[in-house]
Protein backbone atom coordinates (compact mmCIF):
# COMPACT_ATOMS: atom_id res chain seq x y z
CA UNK A 1 0.00 0.00 0.00
CA UNK A 2 2.85 2.40 0.84
CA UNK A 3 4.48 1.71 -2.52
CA UNK A 4 1.22 2.45 -4.35
CA UNK A 5 0.79 5.72 -2.44
CA UNK A 6 4.37 6.73 -3.22
CA UNK A 7 3.96 5.76 -6.85
CA UNK A 8 0.78 7.84 -6.96
CA UNK A 9 2.79 10.94 -6.02
CA UNK A 10 5.47 10.17 -8.59
CA UNK A 11 2.89 9.45 -11.28
CA UNK A 12 0.90 12.64 -10.66
CA UNK A 13 4.09 14.70 -10.50
CA UNK A 14 5.29 13.35 -13.86
CA UNK A 15 1.91 13.79 -15.55
CA UNK A 16 1.81 17.44 -14.52
CA UNK A 17 5.50 17.93 -15.37
CA UNK A 18 5.00 16.48 -18.85
CA UNK A 19 1.95 18.71 -19.34
CA UNK A 20 3.98 21.76 -18.29
CA UNK A 21 6.89 20.77 -20.56
CA UNK A 22 4.59 20.36 -23.56
CA UNK A 23 2.92 23.71 -22.91
CA UNK A 24 6.32 25.40 -22.52
CA UNK A 25 7.39 24.03 -25.89
CA UNK A 26 4.16 24.97 -27.68
CA UNK A 27 3.39 28.39 -26.16
CA UNK A 28 5.25 31.57 -27.01
CA UNK A 29 4.40 33.26 -23.72
CA UNK A 30 6.71 32.29 -20.83
CA UNK A 31 3.85 32.52 -18.30
CA UNK A 32 0.97 30.83 -20.14
CA UNK A 33 2.27 27.25 -19.62
CA UNK A 34 2.41 27.74 -15.85
CA UNK A 35 -1.06 29.29 -15.83
CA UNK A 36 -2.45 26.44 -17.94
CA UNK A 37 -0.92 23.78 -15.72
CA UNK A 38 -2.14 25.50 -12.55
CA UNK A 39 -5.63 25.85 -13.98
CA UNK A 40 -5.63 22.14 -14.79
CA UNK A 41 -4.32 21.17 -11.34
CA UNK A 42 -6.42 23.56 -9.24
CA UNK A 43 -9.54 23.73 -11.37
CA UNK A 44 -12.19 21.10 -10.94
CA UNK A 45 -13.92 21.40 -14.28
CA UNK A 46 -14.93 17.77 -14.63
CA UNK A 47 -16.17 15.19 -12.17
CA UNK A 48 -14.03 14.16 -9.23
CA UNK A 49 -13.27 10.83 -10.96
CA UNK A 50 -11.34 12.73 -13.63
CA UNK A 51 -8.69 13.64 -11.09
CA UNK A 52 -9.01 10.84 -8.53
CA UNK A 53 -8.17 8.17 -11.11
CA UNK A 54 -4.58 9.41 -11.11
CA UNK A 55 -4.43 8.44 -7.44
CA UNK A 56 -5.09 4.79 -8.21
CA UNK A 57 -1.65 4.11 -9.75
CA UNK A 58 -3.27 2.09 -12.50
CA UNK A 59 -1.30 1.26 -15.65
CA UNK A 60 -3.74 3.14 -17.88
CA UNK A 61 -3.16 6.36 -15.94
CA UNK A 62 0.60 5.81 -15.97
CA UNK A 63 0.38 5.51 -19.76
CA UNK A 64 -1.03 9.05 -19.91
CA UNK A 65 2.50 10.30 -19.27
CA UNK A 66 3.37 9.21 -22.82
CA UNK A 67 0.20 10.43 -24.54
CA UNK A 68 1.20 14.07 -24.06
CA UNK A 69 4.66 13.68 -25.70
CA UNK A 70 3.00 11.81 -28.59
CA UNK A 71 0.73 14.79 -29.14
CA UNK A 72 3.60 17.26 -28.85
CA UNK A 73 5.96 15.50 -31.26
CA UNK A 74 3.23 15.01 -33.85
CA UNK A 75 2.34 18.71 -33.71
CA UNK A 76 6.04 19.60 -34.00
CA UNK A 77 6.40 17.35 -37.03
CA UNK A 78 3.47 18.97 -38.83
CA UNK A 79 4.82 22.43 -37.98
CA UNK A 80 8.06 21.58 -39.81
CA UNK A 81 8.43 23.27 -43.17
CA UNK A 82 8.71 20.99 -46.21
CA UNK A 83 12.29 22.07 -46.90
CA UNK A 84 13.38 20.85 -43.45
CA UNK A 85 11.77 17.40 -43.60
CA UNK A 86 15.08 15.65 -44.28
CA UNK A 87 17.03 17.22 -41.40
CA UNK A 88 18.30 15.34 -38.37
CA UNK A 89 16.01 17.40 -36.14
CA UNK A 90 12.93 16.20 -38.01
CA UNK A 91 14.14 12.61 -37.84
CA UNK A 92 14.65 13.05 -34.10
CA UNK A 93 11.13 14.46 -33.71
CA UNK A 94 9.68 11.48 -35.59
CA UNK A 95 11.80 9.08 -33.54
CA UNK A 96 10.58 10.62 -30.30
CA UNK A 97 6.99 10.41 -31.56
CA UNK A 98 7.49 6.72 -32.38
CA UNK A 99 8.93 6.01 -28.93
CA UNK A 100 6.23 7.92 -27.05
CA UNK A 101 3.40 6.34 -29.04
CA UNK A 102 4.87 2.84 -28.69
CA UNK A 103 5.18 3.32 -24.93
CA UNK A 104 1.45 4.05 -24.71
CA UNK A 105 0.79 0.66 -26.34
CA UNK A 106 3.40 -1.13 -24.25
CA UNK A 107 1.89 0.17 -21.00
CA UNK A 108 -1.87 -0.03 -21.62
CA UNK A 109 -4.15 0.01 -24.65
CA UNK A 110 -6.33 2.67 -22.98
CA UNK A 111 -3.62 5.30 -23.44
CA UNK A 112 -3.03 4.17 -27.02
CA UNK A 113 -6.70 4.73 -27.86
CA UNK A 114 -6.51 8.26 -26.45
CA UNK A 115 -3.22 8.96 -28.25
CA UNK A 116 -4.70 7.59 -31.47
CA UNK A 117 -7.74 9.85 -31.21
CA UNK A 118 -5.48 12.83 -30.53
CA UNK A 119 -3.35 11.91 -33.56
CA UNK A 120 -6.46 11.72 -35.76
CA UNK A 121 -7.51 15.16 -34.51
CA UNK A 122 -4.06 16.62 -35.15
CA UNK A 123 -3.95 15.08 -38.64
CA UNK A 124 -7.37 16.64 -39.28
CA UNK A 125 -6.10 20.01 -38.09
CA UNK A 126 -3.08 19.76 -40.35
CA UNK A 127 -5.15 18.16 -43.12
CA UNK A 128 -3.33 19.74 -46.05
CA UNK A 129 0.08 18.78 -44.71
CA UNK A 130 -1.11 15.33 -43.69
CA UNK A 131 -2.33 14.62 -47.22
CA UNK A 132 0.93 15.91 -48.72
CA UNK A 133 2.91 12.91 -49.98
CA UNK A 134 6.14 13.78 -48.14
CA UNK A 135 4.46 14.26 -44.76
CA UNK A 136 2.06 11.34 -45.22
CA UNK A 137 4.79 8.87 -46.11
CA UNK A 138 6.98 9.87 -43.18
CA UNK A 139 4.21 9.79 -40.58
CA UNK A 140 2.85 6.44 -41.81
CA UNK A 141 6.29 4.82 -41.71
CA UNK A 142 6.83 6.27 -38.23
CA UNK A 143 3.44 4.97 -37.07
CA UNK A 144 4.19 1.47 -38.35
CA UNK A 145 7.60 1.52 -36.63
CA UNK A 146 6.07 2.70 -33.34
CA UNK A 147 3.48 -0.10 -33.34
CA UNK A 148 6.20 -2.60 -34.27
CA UNK A 149 8.38 -1.37 -31.36
CA UNK A 150 5.56 -2.04 -28.91
CA UNK A 151 4.23 -5.29 -30.39
CA UNK A 152 7.58 -7.04 -30.99
CA UNK A 153 8.39 -7.69 -27.29
CA UNK A 154 4.78 -8.74 -26.64
CA UNK A 155 4.89 -11.09 -29.63
CA UNK A 156 8.16 -12.65 -28.50
CA UNK A 157 6.75 -13.14 -24.99
CA UNK A 158 3.53 -14.60 -26.43
CA UNK A 159 5.49 -17.09 -28.54
CA UNK A 160 7.40 -17.96 -25.36
CA UNK A 161 4.14 -18.81 -23.57
CA UNK A 162 3.31 -15.57 -21.76
CA UNK A 163 -0.33 -14.52 -22.27
CA UNK A 164 -1.05 -11.14 -23.86
CA UNK A 165 -1.97 -8.12 -21.77
CA UNK A 166 -5.60 -7.99 -20.71
CA UNK A 167 -5.77 -4.40 -21.91
CA UNK A 168 -5.38 -5.50 -25.54
CA UNK A 169 -8.47 -7.69 -25.38
CA UNK A 170 -10.37 -5.00 -23.51
CA UNK A 171 -9.37 -2.29 -25.99
CA UNK A 172 -10.26 -4.39 -29.01
CA UNK A 173 -13.64 -5.22 -27.49
CA UNK A 174 -14.28 -1.49 -26.90
CA UNK A 175 -13.32 -0.69 -30.50
CA UNK A 176 -15.59 -3.48 -31.79
CA UNK A 177 -18.46 -2.24 -29.61
CA UNK A 178 -18.52 -5.22 -27.29
Positions of predicted regions on the chain:
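Transmembrane catalytic cores of multi-pass membrane glycosyltransferases
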Residues: 54, 58, 63, 102-178
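Short coil/turn helix-boundary motifs
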Residues: 81-84, 130-131
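Membrane-embedded helix bundles of polyisoprenyl
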Residues: 7-81, 89-126
Amino acid sequence: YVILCTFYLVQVFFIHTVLLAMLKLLCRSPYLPYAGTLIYILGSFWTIQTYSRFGASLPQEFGMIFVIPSVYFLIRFFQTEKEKLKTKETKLILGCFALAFSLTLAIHFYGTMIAGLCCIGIAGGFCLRFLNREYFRRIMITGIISVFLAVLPMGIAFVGGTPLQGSLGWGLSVINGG
